[in-house]
Amino acid sequence: MLSRRDALKLTAAALMVPKAQPRTTRKVIVAGAGIGGLSCAWQLVRRGHEVVVLEASERTGGHVFTFRDPLDDGLYADAGAEHFTQPGYERYWSYVNEFKLPHRYYPRRDHILRFIGGKMYSPEMLADPKVLEGFGLNRREVEYLKTHPWPELASLYYAPYVDSFRDEYRPFDAGLNHLDQLSTIDLFRKDGASAGALAFIGGSGSALQSVWHAAILKLRGVPLFPPHVYRLVGGNQKLPDAFVERLGSRIRLRSPVTRIEHGQTGVRVTCRSDGGSVTHEADHLVCAMSAVMLRAIPVTPAWPADKAYALQHVPYYFDSRVIFQSRTQFWKRDGISPSMEFGDRELNHVWTTCDEVETARGLIVGTATGLVTPEAALAVYRKRYPGASEDVEKAHVVAWASNPWASACETTSYRPGELVKLWPALIEPHGRIHFVGAYADNLNWGMEAATRSGYRASEAIDKT
């Protein structure tokens, strides 16, 4: 995280950015300094465009935030975006390589212990036919899980549909539009899923959306639940900070947008600042804030009906990051995997991080649904952890739902019938206004969607 003072110190370095010759130099306002807005701004600057980035809060990075204080011994936790995959995240990886950011394999998905019906199951147990039959899975499902990991069960029912998608941005060309009227659980039930399986897979969202997302992953060569994930050494905020270092004083912190005006020849954006109200004029605007924040900003002329509906109705989830610092790495002493799924709202799942930090202490991080207290999350952990050596000494929660500028996390499933209303209206530019962020791409994986949409917007502006 870079403060305003730090950003201003980098002005001289920012002026040395190597620039490509654009077709026509454009003035661009980027509203939002999360990873999507920052990556878009960097792409525009390196193409020679004139850019100002307006950030409402006191820090850059948005949901990419590395938590350090008051942890001890140099420990840190990614309190927002937690990992990236390979394959997948191609645009994100391009920046990691460009800036030569150290990264490491993240074993958080190795040997996950899952609590089902109050009992702990290992990956080996969840491949045992007797265990699976005890859940009420049918013969076909049991056979499938003999050769596929437990989190891939839904792939059995996606398989008949995913090859119908040729262009990952054109879901309605697959000839499966009728699936938007079904929920995923109804589709799986129709296709023979057992009641036992439907306790674990499916859902109430649009079947077309979920099938499409599975198809996108297959086109990218990514499993439904990627087991191999990575993180940046020192915290995933290293990438937003690298953008900030290069953008320098183009970034204006504590500058929340209060009004957007647009026309055929340009845009006018009004924001608050330390000195009152400031208006910026430009050729283009990149809206790189969440749709939740964008809904609250007056726009003149108003959004067209399809864009207004999409921005108003795109659904989000709101999670909290739970962080436990322990006196020792007690799970090693107990011989127990630190990666666990509990399924409780107060603590859904946990894993360990910071294995490269030289300390006897341990760090367990996890996710809770909505707002939760450290005490409630720790109570769940102590209830579920099966070993005898647990010695958590500090518990913290980063509650995104209470953040005034970055409350919304990633988008979640659309209701049946909504995909045709939200796509592609949600991501399409409107005149000289472009849309960037975790909600503004075809797959809702935060840092991947943000960097992909940021690149797409920069390309569109550069080609005008």
Regions found by a protein language model. Give the residues of each.
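Conserved flavin/dinucleotide-binding core of flavoenzymes
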Residues: 47, 124-125, 266, 272, ...
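Glycine-rich FAD pyrophosphate-binding loop
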Residues: 46-67
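Flavin (primarily FAD) binding-site architecture
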Residues: 287-303
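Dinucleotide-binding Rossmann-like beta1-alpha1 core, especially the glycine-rich loop
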Residues: 72-147
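N-terminal secretory signal peptides and thylakoid transit peptides that target proteins
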Residues: 1-14
